[in-house]
Amino acid sequence: MSAARTLRVPGRHGYAAEFSPYLPGRLACAAAQHYGIAGCGTLIILDQNQSGLQIFRSFDWSDGLFDVTWSEDNEHVLVTCSGDGSLQLWDTAKATGPLQVYKEHTQEVYSVDWSQTRGEQLVVSGSWDQTVKVWDPTVGNSLCTFRGHESVIYSTIWSPHIPGCFASASGDQTLRIWDVKTAGVRIVIPAHQTEILSCDWCKYNENLVVTGAVDCSLRGWDLRNVRQPVFELLGHTYAIRRVKFSPFHASVLASCSYDFTVRFWNFSKPDPLLETVEHHTEFTCGLDLSLQSPTEVADCSWDETIKIYDPVCLTVPG
């Protein structure tokens, strides 16, 4: 692996990282003081250049920030979510506070995602109050609230293929698929026998969703037949915090964990573990794969660092 470009952010513990879909080399990171247990949060916007990683702008919030998503409509706009139950809409072109704050959830909001399909600009949020909400960012209140999960919601993510469809993962051990048009749940999958902390949609198969859980396993689900997973990936030694499918390779995905590692997998291979990256000294919570470069990965950790790097398995053919 090439040497990671590293930015140290003293006193801030990283929870989520996401590459800009517009600007090559721009990354957003949601972070919190005191491991998110108390204190404030910071949204860090950084750029990479020949000299490394540099902070372009940072925004503080009065509570920990747990997730971040870029607008699919405006290269300067993004949304974060917080421990105080609110979402914040930011404009990186302005060095001021949020343009708008959306406050309806009654407990921590752990997940936020901006829709990727053309023709709709919607944000989905998942909370410890056991609800999912869908928002039009131009409107101050949510469009609809989805109930059904029986524990905290850790992950909510739009389908990149099907308009108005999103997945959610929860401490109630289920993966659920929802439809905004019917304002209801389409599929309930008892995906693990432990809390599920993350899920993601395959970019090349509209029926494939992956889950990552406290049981250290990743499982792939074909939504046409959910009786058993189509693959299971084992190797992490502590809970899997986040999982992301590759935007460039149909069967490649990455996961990060409380075991401090990031692992890369190809679920179509007999030996699916491609590479294990061990460059953090604390829980690794944030992870993203670049939409612009097939080899570039970003992560962030509770060790107060953000890293961008090119794992060997993505730089060599096969």
Curated annotation (Swiss-Prot):
WD repeat extents: 60-100, 104-145, 148-188, 191-231, 235-275, 279-317
CDD domains cross-referenced by the UniProt entry: WD40
Signal peptide positions on this chain: none
Domain of life: Eukaryota
GO molecular function, one term: protein homodimerization activity
GO cellular component: cytosol; peroxisomal matrix
Localization in the cell: Cytoplasm, Cytosol; Peroxisome matrix
Sorted UniProt keywords: Cytoplasm, Peroxisome, Protein transport, Repeat, Transport, WD repeat
Keyword Repeat (UniProt): yes
Main location group: cytoplasm
Biological process terms in GO annotation: endochondral ossification; ether lipid biosynthetic process; fatty acid beta-oxidation; neuron migration; protein import into peroxisome matrix; protein targeting to peroxisome
InterPro entries: G-protein_beta_WD-40_rep (IPR020472), PEX7 (IPR044536), WD40/YVTN_repeat-like_dom_sf (IPR015943), WD40_repeat_CS (IPR019775), WD40_repeat_dom_sf (IPR036322), WD40_rpt (IPR001680)
Pfam families from the UniProt entry: WD40 (PF00400)
KW Cytoplasm (keyword) present: yes
Function of the molecule: Receptor required for the peroxisomal import of proteins containing a C-terminal PTS2-type peroxisomal targeting signal. Specifically binds to cargo proteins containing a PTS2 peroxisomal targeting signal in the cytosol. Cargo protein-binding triggers interaction with PEX5 and formation of a ternary complex composed of PEX5 and PEX7 along with PTS2-containing cargo proteins, which is tranlocated into peroxisomes by passing through the PEX13-PEX14 docking complex.
Assembly behavior: Interacts with PEX5; interaction only takes place when PEX7 is associated with cargo proteins. Interacts with VWA8.
Protein family: Belongs to the WD repeat peroxin-7 family.
Protein name, entry field: Peroxisomal targeting signal 2 receptor
Phylogenetic placement of the source organism: Eukaryota, Metazoa, Chordata, Craniata, Vertebrata
Gene name, Swiss-Prot/TrEMBL: PEX7
